[in-house]
């Protein structure tokens, strides 16, 4: 039908963004200015607002946006922040809003891979092994303090994240869709921890750093919590709505100039001198991998989607650059001695690379 593929109930434009697509009960259309007039299912943005309202009881609206970006781009999030900043609240609220299954894994030094993925149990009665699935079989996983468990446990989780399947007793099981892992690290306590190797950290689409709330925000948090006057999360959407929205996100338009901008930013982390950033040459021990370009492009499309736009703009790239790149750039001892971290390196690159 005139080059428009059908994805279930979603009609998606291949080229030209002025096509009206029906999605279940709602419509997604892009007007001549390229704005998304209604987003996928109109309930989707309602779901997003609902999550934001509940999470805002602890002022975590920006974290919710990042979770939704990862969810729409089929990625995972690494969170760094001290305890008590409503990380669990944000992801459990998101799961409730999408009527999805949520599990929390508390990582400890004595945890075993079988505790996460599941194991075989022998039944003497029927003299057979049966499979007992682990808590990894859920849509949303909170891996709390991932750096507290030994490497073999971390790699079991990271393999599941990458392959989206696990093997128990030689049998493979596909994980639920959607599948989002939010892993947390406490930046303060480093004693008795097992730091994630660079190759493992690279598998997280975003690394988000959460800071303390501002004075006014904390006053509202305190009042709301004491008065117990916070909104409850209701199931507004279903997991299948996420999968539908993902199909639409893929169709968000990204101009070649934006693609080039993303490539230039990532290449500047590898070859800073080619972009006139000679001072960074001795500050970077290794630059971002091709995963950075792929993830930055995917995240920008999802960001445009939640901002109700049918196309990506340079501001989207700049807004997400730190989250996508901060854990993919290695800094040298020289940089550490001068108190220069990856944040400053990314800011220097953004200030230098030409904006399309």
Task: Locate predicted features.
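An extended, acidic
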Residues: 35-66, 251-260, 269-273, 281-298, ...
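P-loop (Walker A) phosphate-binding loop of NTP-binding proteins
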Residues: 82, 116, 184
């Amino acid at each position: 039908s005139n080059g428009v593929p059908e994805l279930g109930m979603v009609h998606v434009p291949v080229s030209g963004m002025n096509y009206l697509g029906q999605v279940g009960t709602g419509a997604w259309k892009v007007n001549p200015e390229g704005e998304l007039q209604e987003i996928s299912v109109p309930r989707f943005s309602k779901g997003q607002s609902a999550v934001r309202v509940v999470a805002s009881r602890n002022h975590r609206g920006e974290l919710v946006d990042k979770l939704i970006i990862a969810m729409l781009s089929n990625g995972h999030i690494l969170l760094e922040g001290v305890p008590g900043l409503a990380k669990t609240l944000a992801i459990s609220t998101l799961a409730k809003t999408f009527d999805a299954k949520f599990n929390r894994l508390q990582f400890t030094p004595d945890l075993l891979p079988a505790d996460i993925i599941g194991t075989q149990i022998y039944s003497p009665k029927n003299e057979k092994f049966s499979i007992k699935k682990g808590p990894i079989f859920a849509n949303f996983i909170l891996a709390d303090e991932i750096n507290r468990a030994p490497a073999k446990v971390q790699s079991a989780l990271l393999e599941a994240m990458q392959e989206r399947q696990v093997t128990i007793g030689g049998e493979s099981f596909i994980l639920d869709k959607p599948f989002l892992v939010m892993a947390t690290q406490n930046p303060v306590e480093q004693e008795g921890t097992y730091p994630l190797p660079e190759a493992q950290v690279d598998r997280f689409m975003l690394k988000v750093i959460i800071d303390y709330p501002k004075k006014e925000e904390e006053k509202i948090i305190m009042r709301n919590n004491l008065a117990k006057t916070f909104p409850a999360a209701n199931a507004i959407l279903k997991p299948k709505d996420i999968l539908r929205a993902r199909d639409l996100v893929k169709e968000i338009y990204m101009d070649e100039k934006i693609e080039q901008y993303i490539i230039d930013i990532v290449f500047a982390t590898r070859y800073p001198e080619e972009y006139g950033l000679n001072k960074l040459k001795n500050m970077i021990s290794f630059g971002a991998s091709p995963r950075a370009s792929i993830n930055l492009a995917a995240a920008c499309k999802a960001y445009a989607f939640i901002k109700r736009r049918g196309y990506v703009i340079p501001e989207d790239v700049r807004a997400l650059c730190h989250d996508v790149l901060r854990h993919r750039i290695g800094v040298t001892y020289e940089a550490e001695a001068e108190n220069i971290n990856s944040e400053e390196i990314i800011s220097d690159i953004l200030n230098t690379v030409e904006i399309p």
